[in-house]
Amino acid sequence: MIPTEPAKITEKKYRFDSFGNGEVFAGNKKGRLPAMGWNSWNAFGSGNTEALTKVMADKIVELGLDKLGYKYVVLDDGCYKSEREDGKLSNEPVKFPSGFKALSDYVHERGLKFGMYNDIGTNLCAGAAVGTCGFEKTDAKSYVDWGVDFLKIDNCYYLWDNATFSNPENARYVFAPNIKGIEIRSSGAEGGFSKKISALDGSLRGCGASVKNDYVTGIGTFDGTNTGTTPVGPMSGELVFEVEVPEAGEYELVVCYATDRVNGCGEWLQVACDCGSEEDSNVVYDDLLVPTKSSEDFVESDAIKIKLCAGLNKIRLMNHRRQENTLCSYAAMLEGLNEAEPGHDVLLSLCEWGKTQPQNWGYKVGDSWRILNDITFRVGRDGDAGFGAWIDPGTPSVTSQYNKAVIMDEFAGLEKGWNDPDMLMVGMNGMTTQMSQTHFSMWCMMNSPLMLGLDLRRVQKGDELYNIIANRELIALNQDALGVQAKRIFTTAACVCGGGAVTAPDKDYITDCDRVDVLAKPLSDGSLALCFLNLSEKEKCGDFEIGVDLIKKYLGEKLPADFYAANSFDVVNLWSGEKTCVSADEAGSGTFCVKKLEGCGNVTLKICAR
């Protein structure tokens, strides 16, 4: 049954305050390296078929890509009937006549793994009314019966957020009302304690909430779907009041508020109280308030019962439901899989496009999480390779995805999961060989999932496309057992997105692509991968120099002491195969050096201490 309201949260593990505790939900296995495989969407959009999927599986084996780690064959949108049958998912009979179990068996017989797609909303992004919302247990049983190894789960038509194709008024669930003030008073006795506090006398915590006139607005989590906002730092805003009461006991909280159903002002309020650390914070109210006539028509709420300690207390007015609701929805599918097959090995790929800042909570339920909207909206079809862009002011480009993912290394790892800047566009129209090589280098250095998105019938062993997607040395960086995403340690950029000087290349969000970046990635054998990237479409010349001291500053103990103390280094260019040797004196003065980078080009080196 499709629910009529967001899930009631009764366990603290789903709460915002638990996002940073490192606890992973049951059934979400960790220790896996980034997934590698093929996904149908960029290649064929909704036009994928059973016949095409079988050919792609055969081509993976024929080309030897399976031996390089490409294991997953994933059906994206367009494979189901448009509506459920007897409450269950079923195959689109023209495109997938044999059914999903037969196709799964075909893929498994070739030593590969089988993946499918769905959505936490009511519908899939292409429109079919078969989203998992309310059907998680039923669908999980189907996926287990079909032998599914990988689930990509999207975020369209989501009921509890203003996501793609969702009702814009769903903003009511994910933002608190505008707040003018509060009153704290003794419970049930006249003449007792009473104190009114203006919102202007509260403190704003986090990011997003702001003062407007005499009230606070924007209490919630800001939308990360698009470019222009950093993924590093606080993603939510709260209004916090400090209240001192004479004695411990039950009090009443009355909130002066006004509602709307737009970004920044909603109807859902969460109230938490604590008299010590935030870990002791108790959510005492978590629901919709009665709507008001407008966002500036303030009224008083009904009294909310709260318990306070004698002395100083903090009262937090907030709305973390954008993140909490989405976590609950993905967790429902994970829990369904746990019930259908305890000990299952299904990999969950969360595709909510960075909307709810999944880098904060995605590790609890998933193996990877998308960080932005799609890398391309011009997908291919049978006979058409589709189009991929190098630069775009929105999300659909290599550099847009890279610019965000490159500063998200702190969120990734074997015990967490992987930032997902979407599928590879190697082989699409618009992507030159140089662009494709650099795109592949970026994704390998950043430990991104390597999901091919091209018609593999266009690839022959030894051709340009093959030599990119089958570069063993680059793949080895992505699949290195240490599982550490590269860190940007140098950039020629002067300004961060929105203005201001670059002060921390590993954390600053930079969107101006007229620059050179250098990424450093420690490897399990004690060596280092160093990647020089030209994000501009124009050639860049100069002495782009990286010294051991700079590497040590950013990587520290992630590299062994022997590396920093080495007398010389063997250096291999992982695209050209060229080998050189650099002495310690040279390295110390900064001569891991590249003097020229082609437009959209890269030089990716593996550096081993002698």
What would you call each of these model-derived segments?
Residues 34-40, 69-76, 113-118, 149-154, ...:
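Structural recognition of the beta-strand scaffold that forms the well-ordered cores
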Residues 256, 443-453, 509-559:
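Carbohydrate-binding surface patches
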Residues 168-324, 540, 551-568, 574, ...:
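Extracytoplasmic
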Residues 192, 218, 222-224, 228, ...:
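Aromatic- and carboxylate-lined catalytic core of secreted/periplasmic carbohydrate-active enzymes
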Residues 52-166:
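Aromatic-lined carbohydrate-binding/catalytic grooves of carbohydrate-active enzymes
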